[in-house]
Amino acid sequence: MAVVPIRIVGDPVLHTATTPVTVAADGSLPADLAQLIATMYDTMDAANGVGLAANQIGCSLRLFVYDCAADRAMTARRRGVVINPVLETSEIPETMPDPDTDDEGCLSVPGESFPTGRAKWARVTGLDADGSPVSIEGTGLFARMLQHETGHLDGFLYLDRLIGRYARNAKRAVKSHGWGVPGLSWLPGEDPDPFGH
């Protein structure tokens, strides 16, 4: 099991768009990609996350892993990897997010969560770990995760989507933790679980 540190908001790798994974003419993926995917799964599992983008562990490649239920109350989960994902969503509401149903957290903003407006439905297309085409879609928490992880790969954190008082509260939280600078990380399994799982 290889668990690696998760970068914290302010690290440049989190705020820069990732590079697509190179696919050979025969459709094969780089040989070392399988090890990266295994490390991402191990790290996500140790952190009790529902998703993890490669740049959250310092790798600037366009892929994410997930282990997520359709809704917060459900126990059945979907698990996989998407390489070079392309996101499609329903319309994103223009109203203030509901603090009871739209709360969102992030392993790169450990221990914090803020209401975030997201589309109710999302689909991601890309490649699986074998290089075969994959299309996954969902609503609720699963749709939120798809949008969250592809946002990471585009160089954005969910904090960048916050509006109004939630954006102000997030800025205060980042400042109070001393985040927003390069080089900060936490190690799942060694550092305390910031979300209290």
UniProtKB/Swiss-Prot annotation:
Q: Which Pfam families match?
A: Pep_deformylase
Q: Which CDD domains match?
A: Pep_deformylase (cd00487)
GO terms for molecular function, please?
metal ion binding; peptide deformylase activity
User: Can you state which reaction this protein catalyses?
Assistant: N-terminal N-formyl-L-methionyl-[peptide] + H2O = N-terminal L-methionyl-[peptide] + formate
Q: Does the keyword Magnesium apply?
A: no
Keyword line? Hydrolase, Iron, Metal-binding, Protein biosynthesis
Q: Is the keyword Hydrolase in the record?
A: yes
InterPro entries (alphabetical): Peptide_deformylase (IPR023635), Peptide_deformylase_sf (IPR036821)
One biological process GO term for this chain? translation
NCBIfam families found in the cross-reference section: pept_deformyl, PRK00150.1-3, PRK12846.1-4
Q: Beyond the main fields, what else does the record say?
A: Was identified as a high-confidence drug target.
Q: What does this protein do?
A: Removes the formyl group from the N-terminal Met of newly synthesized proteins. Requires at least a dipeptide for an efficient rate of reaction. N-terminal L-methionine is a prerequisite for activity but the enzyme has broad specificity at other positions.
Name under which the protein is recorded: Peptide deformylase
Specify the species. Answer: Mycobacterium tuberculosis (strain ATCC 25618 / H37Rv)
